[in-house]
Amino acid sequence: MTDQTTRLPVRRALISVSDKTGVVDFARELEALGVEILSTGGTFKLLRENGIAAIEVADYTGFPEMMDGRVKTLHPKIHGGILGRRDLDGAVMAEHGIAPIDLVAVNLYPFAATVAKPGCTLPDAIENIDIGGPTMVRSAAKNHKDVAIVVNAEDYAAVVDNLKNGGLTYAQRFDLALKAFEHTAGYDGMIANYLGGIDQSTEQLSTDNRSLFPRTYNMQFIKAQDMRYGENPHQQAAFYVEKPDEACVATARQLQGKELSFNNVADTDAALECVKSFTKPACVIVKHANPCGVAVVPENEGGIRKAYDLAYATDSESAFGGIIAFNRELDGETAQAIVERQFVEVIIAPKVSQAARDVVASKANVRLLECGEWPAERSPGWDYKRVNGGLLIQSRDIGMITEADLKIVTQRAPTEQEIHDLIFAWKVAKFVKSNAIVYAKNRQTVGVGAGQMSRVNSARIAAIKAEHAGLQVQGAVMASDAFFPFRDGIDNAAKAGITAVIQPGGSMRDNEVIAAADEAGIAMVFTGMRHFRH
């Protein structure tokens, strides 16, 4: 049985890295500890230029680097030194003059960066598939009982600190080995994804028309937390994250409150992604992944405090136990209004002031998240939906429209105010479960109908919600995430007092729907873009 606490010293290390961040300082620390350093290629040159007495692998093995660097470390003196079991293979190693290598610091050719370059050819990609690196990494990781493997520059300092304290424990070497296997798994996955997208239907393979969807799909997510349970208490769950390009729930920092639940994460994602759609101060309140209240206010006209008041007024009942997201720094006044007015599960904002933190601290269970700023232009990416026996993959729905994209299809054109409200309502409808209907006025939701099997019933629910909240539908606009299959949706909207409608268009009965709008004096615009959300 392996001793979990015994520290193993390092007498010989092999360093060969593509990412040279921190490697000189790391090697210098090892040298100061009396460690003999073997190295290759550019790493060897860099170390020697910085006064570190590294030994080139070709000199160590007596076998030259060859084939344009394809064969450097693939030698028994290297792999025997890494893979040799100290308690079993000592005699064989001595017989063949193989010295043990106790630490391997390797990271791999930058395949992802290479294939991301414009004009990257298949030969370019192939030449950047590392062979010797993964072989050493896997060898060292397999023999972690006797060898430490370091694939991440972020681990250099901790490794040095432990060596100064006598060496690395088995538990530490095991953790480094796990990171190594994760590293090579991700690397091989990238290669398989890239090559799997190449069109093989022609004799001359080319990267020109590479498919976005490879033959096998490989992704790597890192566990952020285990959860008490999933969507329901009888389901097990965990939260895994990738490395996103923008601020999101996965990157958010929790400042206080209970641990996030499975449903908290899903609902917070919905709220934050919705509020990102707006450039002016905005508040989004979400319940069960649906916006139940959204408002946007002009700059210098009350800020997020006013936006929160208006969003809350849409549906104060549903806001109870909801998620609140802002696109501006959370201030103390707004935080005070929230905690005095309602029970809230999560509050998320790009930044949280100290005054707001002090206020929310009075409600210890409230989860307060700070996610950082996001760019105006949304990052492309992928959405996944698990089905029994498979996985659906699609590009993220980041499609948006501007006033220039609107096609006026009715006799009456919308007023300037109606256009502002139509675009606002359209942005909200994108985040409402289909069939989605949103009533809005003065960039405030006045009624939201979500998740109904018939579109007309979603419209009826939006009207009921508005009436229940005491909000005026007369003069409001309506957004629909998909086309109206029949005129009844417009007829009901007219009875409720709707004056303008935004929808994708594209129904076989568009003419009937347009006629219904004209009969009621309703202005209607088509976007040509659908926003189903399931």
From Swiss-Prot:
Listed Gene3D superfamilies: 3.40.140.20, Methylglyoxal synthase-like domain
Pfam families found in the cross-reference section: AICARFT_IMPCHas (PF01808), MGS (PF02142)
Keywords: Hydrolase, Multifunctional enzyme, Purine biosynthesis, Transferase
Domain of life: Bacteria
Domain notes per entry: The IMP cyclohydrolase activity resides in the N-terminal region.
PANTHER family, alphabetized: BIFUNCTIONAL PURINE BIOSYNTHESIS PROTEIN ATIC (PTHR11692:SF0), BIFUNCTIONAL PURINE BIOSYNTHESIS PROTEIN PURH (PTHR11692)
Protein name per the record: Bifunctional purine biosynthesis protein PurH
The species this protein was found in: Stutzerimonas stutzeri (strain A1501) (Pseudomonas stutzeri)
